[in-house]
Amino acid sequence: MPAMPSGYFLAIAGNIGVGKTELTDRLARELGWYAYYEPVIQNPYLDDFYKDMSRWAFHLQIYFLSERFKAQVTIGDAADAFIQDRTIYEDRWIFARTLHEQGDMSKVDYENYTALFDILAGFLRKPDLILYLKASPETLMERIARRGRESEKSITIEYLRRLGRAYDEWIEQARGEFEVEVVDTDQVPLQGPTAAFHDLVEELKRRYPPQVPLPLPPARPR
């Protein structure tokens, strides 16, 4: 098991298009923390996945599992504070599960994936806090359309609904393992210089006061 680090670890969770990356970026700048972003742009499978989920579901999930494991190992080894855009736990409990349940990941692939996840997760430091952002499927569709990623044009509202149901079930389960805060972004706007964003920053500063900066550990060989 990893040694107990001294830096803070905040994870931002939530459905596609809910605003995780923007919030991660803004909080990192406001708090002076390091940010780890979801590896979307570099993902070699994402475009193909949205065209043919059944063909690429397992490949995509293994890629995300690998990348997020490496990121979380780095976070666990460091003494500085980090914010992570989407957690490794969402890969397992939201995306892989939903893809399997809707028939896009076979039983054998799903079982192999979950077995690998269970092994890897045991080596990881858990977040100090998971901030779960939620929004209605209609809001998510609007935000996805607004950011205009070519690979996301085929996302359906029904897929977002399925993911949302999986998120709601997982969050109830996760409360027994992690500290969790839920923000309904339809009701509590965090985009832009809102009072809600200011209040969130102040609350995080209160809960996680600044630490004396320490150097990051050397990069792990890849």
Kindly label every feature range from the protein language model.
Residues 12:
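Hydrophobic anchor at the beta1->P-loop junction of P-loop NTPases
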Residues 20:
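Conserved lysine of the Walker
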Residues 68-108:
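A basic- and aromatic-enriched beta-loop-alpha substructure that forms the phosphate/nucleotide-
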Residues 141-222:
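NTP-dependent small-molecule kinase module
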Residues 29-67, 94:
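Conserved substrate/cofactor phosphate-moiety recognition/catalytic segment
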